Amino acid sequence: MVKLRLKRYGRKQQPSYRIVAMDSRSKRDGKAIEELGFYNPITNETRIDIAKILKRLKQGAQTTRTVKNILNEAQIIAKENS
């Protein structure tokens, strides 16, 4: 199953994450199928390729809870309860 999740990179105590599509059985920092965006929790900076994310979601990719929250904040996907 393909999941949209975060892949950590950056220095110690200064994490940055790439939003990637990868197999759910892969390691957190393993090989990604496709890079879809960027998230920095320290500066709260987010860059997202909306077209690629929507394409992956239409193909049946699942999101992790954190990525879903990031996409909700960016108003890319609607909240389920709304």
Curated annotation (Swiss-Prot):
A GO CC term assigned to this protein in UniProt: chloroplast
This protein's record includes keyword Plastid: yes
GO BP term, example:
mitochondrial translation
The molecular function terms in GO held by this entry are: structural constituent of ribosome
The UniProt keywords, alphabetically, are: Chloroplast, Plastid, Ribonucleoprotein, Ribosomal protein
Subcellular location(s): the record lists:
Plastid, Chloroplast
**Which superkingdom is the protein from?**
Eukaryota
- Tell me the protein family, please: Belongs to the bacterial ribosomal protein bS16 family.
Name of this protein: Small ribosomal subunit protein bS16c
Q: Which organism is it from?
A: Porphyra purpurea
Gene encoding the protein: rps16
